[in-house]
Amino acid sequence: MKPVVFFLLAVLLSGTGCQTISYYTQAAKGQAQVLFGQQRICEMIKDPKLPEELKGKFQLTLELREFARNELKMNPGNNYLKYRNLNRKYVLWVVYAAPELSVKLETWWYPIVGEFTSRGFFVEQDARKYAARLQEKGKDVFVGGAPAYSTLGWFNDPVLNTFINYPEADFAELIFHELAHHHLFISDDATFNESFATAVAQIGVARWLKSNRGIEQHDLYLARCARRHTLSELLAVGRNNLKKLYNSNKSESEKREGKKKVITSLKMDLVTLSESDPGYRKVAVWAKRPINNALLGARSVYHRRVPAFFALYEESNRDMEVFLSEVEKISRLKKKKRDSILAEYETKSRAKINSPINQN
């Protein structure tokens, strides 16, 4: 509890306003809720009353930690050695927002991490109230549930009930994603951080499946990643079309009408994709949900630079030590230079790699 109290006091003493104090108060309470009531996984596994499925997932967690250490060259520290049941579906509800006629996400400033493109709440109602206030100001908003988050080394992150029942590959993906944040996180660049973690997670799962579950499971996962990549590309096209519209010389009323047409066209393309192959069936859900600047921006944060990191991984001869070393070098550059280099790698990715992680 002491680190939580210290963190809250630091915020209170920094001269922030009432709304900010209220926000960090709920954040401190929420983090405390995650910290208290944790159980050691090594002790839980010994309990003969523990369901076999849960025991298996805990054993898998320990296995993934070692795989991350030995094969992915990321130190797991003391993360994922404990379990916490929060008795709810998500640990956080995350709010994204963007202006009505811009694809650029709103940002919020936080201690330590700097500017970030989302606002997280431990109570769903709080997130939706905050989103409603932004909507009243004319913003596009999107609220999404998060099963996990990284405390970036301030605390040891536990396994949570919010993702314990995930299928193996999804579970491993989440663990590797969050450990990637522990390994490398830079301030003021959410797209770099999340795209890097997404790439590492997919690379890690592909390697883990090939080593531990066989080539069939590995290939099925790669096919799934390729479908995800196709969806991301389609959504990126829609977002880019909106960006061109917003940057045009058209009037605001013309832009609003154009926005409706672009989103309608995007939804039609999503339906077409969902009907093109049984593997894309779930894409139909995207066509039914409200699509706006905030939703497309949130998706972009997690996927925009993923192809660039895949290309860098390939150029590193799939050597994780070399790959991570190169990423760390890029991370130390100024944002403009960093983006330029990643854009070059993205071009290489499009030219050479058909699958997002081509590991045959």
Please provide the spans of the model-predicted regions.
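Bacterial N-terminal signal peptides
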Residues: F6-T16
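Acidic/His-rich structured neighborhood in mature extracellular/periplasmic domains
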Residues: L64-R228, N240
